[in-house]
Amino acid sequence: MTGVQTCALPISPVVANSVAVNRLLNPSTAALPITAVETPSAPARPTGIGEFDRVLDGGLVPGSVTLLSGEPGIGKSTLLLQLVGAWSGTSLYVSAEESTQQVRLRAERLGVRRDDVLLMSALSLSDIVAAIDKNVPSLVVVDSIQTIADDALDSAPGSVVQVRECAFRLVQEAKARSIAVLIVGHVTKEGSIAGPRLL
């Protein structure tokens, strides 16, 4: 028998969400000559923080995911709060390590008082995606990738599977919605990204 056949057996959520299955179900486009590839319609958007924009070659590109890593306590969260405060548009700051009250206190000290800066304390990837659906931000900050988890996976936050799947899903969301996503990754004393070095 030829052709595609359907399977009567259900696919488990873990298999359905795996990177390998997603690659099979959503194959990449064919190779094209570089001159045939469309250039992005939206150039890099300045963040409002000059030095940060210089490092990023002009700002954040819609549809991209940027990893900001550094040792704990170095000021990553503070820098990102300043960034959402300077961002021109709605931003969603997801803290998986602190409560919204703690983040608000730090934001107050930095002078970030805008109604279009949305705060969320969440550990679940599905909650984060639902908030993106509901609020349609142009910038999403996830602090940090090692502490969020996909509830469909049977592994702890920060594990190889969780970090891979959560990062992969955030990349998909960024591309599908043409939004900029910033992910925080902690660095160990040895200088490597905490958890699996898969990002």
Residues covered by each model-derived region:
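Short, small-residue-biased leader/transition segments that mark boundaries at the very start
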Residues: 2-9
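Charged, amphipathic alpha-helical linker segments immediately N-terminal to NTP-binding catalytic cores
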Residues: 15-42
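Conserved phosphate/pyrophosphate-binding and hydrolysis machinery centered on Walker-type P-loop NTPases
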Residues: 42-49, 73, 96, 156, ...
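Phosphate-binding P-loop
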Residues: 44, 55-63, 72
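Short gly/ser/thr-rich secondary-structure transition/capping motifs
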Residues: 46-52, 119-123
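Conserved inter-motif catalytic segment of the P-loop NTP-binding fold
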Residues: 63, 71-74, 78-172
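Phosphate-binding/switch region of NTP-binding enzymes
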Residues: 164, 168-199
